[in-house]
């Protein structure tokens, strides 16, 4: 479990937000509105779970310091992804109100900004929509990355399959 560092002042939160690419498209007024709402900065030690698969906590997180790794319970030794400063995670559960589908562990000492639904409900509708649009952009980019990886994997699998056929044909030729 992480340690809550503090509830940051609006000025401290604004400084953090200004350094995060996710918030680059927001105006100064929108960033200020966001910074004035309650949020938490939480620190996690090395190898500590930030998010656990199956959890029903519906917050979204932004990595402020350190690195984190993504895993799944069915593949515990496989690192699906490594998250770096500025990474957004937890947005799927936040948007769909469904349990977490992955684990996120601090790879090193990490700080995250945790944002919950109560905070989002206090935002002006335009700011809230912009946040949702940014979430969608993150999801679209991830989907594009997954499609690229899937195509690469398919090409590799076809090459392996063809190599197996070629090998079998050569093996059969030698045995004749």
Task: Enumerate the predicted regions with their spans.
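Cytosolic regulatory regions built on CNB/CRP/Popeye-like sensor folds
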Residues: 1-176
């Amino acid at each position: 479990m992480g340690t809550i560092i503090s509830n940051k002042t609006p000025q401290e939160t604004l400084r953090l937000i200004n350094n995060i690419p996710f918030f680059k498209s927001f105006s100064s007024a929108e960033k200020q509105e966001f910074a004035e709402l309650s949020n938490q900065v939480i620190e996690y030690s090395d190898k500590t779970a930030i998010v656990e698969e199956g959890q029903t906590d519906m917050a979204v997180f932004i990595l402020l310091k350190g690195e984190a790794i993504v895993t799944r319970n069915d593949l515990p030794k496989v690192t699906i992804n490594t998250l770096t400063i500025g990474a957004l995670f937890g947005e799927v559960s936040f948007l769909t109100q469904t349990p977490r589908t992955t684990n996120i562990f601090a790879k090193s000492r990490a700080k995250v900004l945790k944002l919950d639904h109560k905070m989002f409900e206090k935002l002006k509708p335009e700011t809230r929509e912009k946040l949702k649009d940014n979430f969608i952009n993150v999801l679209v980019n991830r989907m594009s990355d997954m499609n690229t990886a899937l195509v690469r994997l398919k090409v590799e699998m076809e090459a392996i399959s063809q190599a197996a056929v070629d090998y079998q044909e050569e093996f059969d030729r030698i045995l004749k």
